[in-house]
UniProtKB/Swiss-Prot annotation:
GO cellular component: a single term: cytosolic large ribosomal subunit
Entry keyword Ribosomal protein: yes
GO molecular function, one term: structural constituent of ribosome
Protein's name according to its UniProt entry: Large ribosomal subunit protein bL35
Coiled-coil intervals, chain numbering: none
Keyword Ribonucleoprotein found: yes
Family, as annotated: Belongs to the bacterial ribosomal protein bL35 family.
UniProt gene name: rpmI
Keywords: Ribonucleoprotein, Ribosomal protein
Length: 67
């Protein structure tokens, strides 16, 4: 049976932390920022964890991550 391939888009977007959680960047922070408030842009900073309900699809996209 051939090797399971990792989705190239997923390996660029997600990183697995040592505890088994997956971190991701925030969306809505790339363009059209003039109409967004400063408070809204400030809350979009930083890294957040992937929601528990999405971990199944992330595990399928990253088979070698051991999730």
């Amino acid at each position: 049976m051939p090797k399971m391939k990792t989705k190239s888009s997923a390996k660029k977007r997600f990183r697995v932390r040592p505890g088994g959680t997956v971190k991701r960047g925030q969306a809505f922070k790339r363009h059209i920022l003039t109409k967004k408030t400063t408070k809204n842009k400030r809350h979009l900073r930083g890294i957040v964890n992937v929601h528990e309900g999405d971990m199944g699809s992330i595990a399928k996209m990253l088979p070698s991550a051991g999730l």
